[in-house]
Amino acid sequence: GYEEIFKSNDITHYEIIATSAFRDTTNSEEARRYIETAIHHPLRIISGLEEAKLIGFHPQASAGKTKLFVDLGGGSTEFYFRQREEIEIRSFQLGAVRNMLKKDEIEEWKRLEAWLLSIKPVRKLTGIGGNIKSFLESQNATSLKIKDFNERAGQLSQLTTKKKILTYQFSPDRADVIDDALK
């Protein structure tokens, strides 16, 4: 399990956290206790803003002048915007699973749009998280221009879930939601 991996990499201090799915469920406390018992380690449920703040630990977050990072999860999307020494973090209740289930709220999309229009335009957006990592790996790329990204995401969306699993070795859960994550 995770403990062996941590030991083999000399990791002695760690924290296990839960994000949007735990924040939004009605039985989060019961689920948290169940998991803690199963893994013999505390599990902390963090806020969306705390989740966004963690993006600051990304190796590229402190380099350069203006940076915008986005972490699109299943239930929420976090942004970390850095302009010189000024940092803004935001969390929106917009995620791949919410999108797939048509549970995104139009007001939340409007909040996101207003915030994006309020910040300095950026030339490069850095996506982090499982969906973008899986997508880029499937394209044998580490970055894409927006035109290429949209074109390749469109091509991927034409494949069935089964074909995505067979062609790109996506897990069933990833293959099921990746199109909604890339929209």
Language model features with spans:
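Conserved catalytic-loop position in the HRD/HxD motif
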Residues: 71
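Acidic, divalent-metal-coordinating active-site segment for phosphoryl/phosphodiester hydrolysis
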Residues: 75-81
